Design a protein with these regions (language model features):
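Hydrophobic-core positions in well-structured secondary-structure elements of globular domains
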Residues: 1-191
Length: 191
């Protein structure tokens, strides 16, 4: 059990450690990052703001997203990484109705106007809400995201020479991508 420096003060949590992980280390103007390949070919990204920056700073800047979306990144180096990740379980429920309405999708929420006749002809129906719930959990057994479970895999070219410590002991951003398309993006402020 080690301290995690949350915005509300230090908390004790269990960290998972992987020493001398051979992987690419990425960096941007205000962050460092590593990614792990998951069993299905997806990637789990860990993006740590540099000292003096917050997750909000990195999210607002958007450079991290350019890195996640690209196959090659100019600030990338094959290294040995001592990775330390806290176990975490984050979930979120988002009301999508407001977003749909702002995009002009309103009829489906209006009684008498919604047309779901292809689904049911017996009675007129309409939607009263649209919500998305997401849960991402990471522990020694792997990554669970939404309704599927994936486990880290490994492959490696020639061993790197440089070694760095990448310790996620303060708020960080995570992302799960498939074919460079983000499936989940979140922040961990309190594992």
């Amino acid at each position: 059990i080690e301290p995690f420096h949350s915005p509300d003060g230090d908390i004790s949590c269990t960290f998972m450690n992987k020493d001398l992980l051979q992987t690419d280390y990425y960096w941007g103007e205000d962050f460092g990052a590593v990614s792990l390949w998951l069993k299905n070919g997806s990637r789990m990204w860990f993006i740590l703001p540099d000292e003096g920056y917050t997750t909000a700073d990195v999210l607002a800047d958007g450079e991290y997203m350019q890195m996640v979306l690209q196959q090659e990144w100019e600030n990338e180096k094959w290294m040995k990484v001592n990775l330390s990740v806290p176990k975490f379980d984050v979930n979120s429920t988002i009301n999508l109705k407001d977003g749909f309405e702002k995009m002009g999708v309103t009829d489906v929420f209006t009684e008498g106007t919604a047309n779901f006749s292809e689904i049911t002809a017996d009675m007129p129906i309409f939607l009263t809400a649209a919500n998305q719930s997401v849960r991402v959990q990471i522990d020694e057994e792997g990554v669970k995201a939404a309704a599927y479970i994936e486990f880290p895999g490994a492959g490696s070219p020639a061993p790197p020479e440089e070694i760095i410590d990448f310790i996620l002991d303060r708020p960080f951003i995570f992302a799960i991508t498939t074919a460079n398309i983000p499936l989940f993006i979140g922040t961990v402020n309190n594992p």
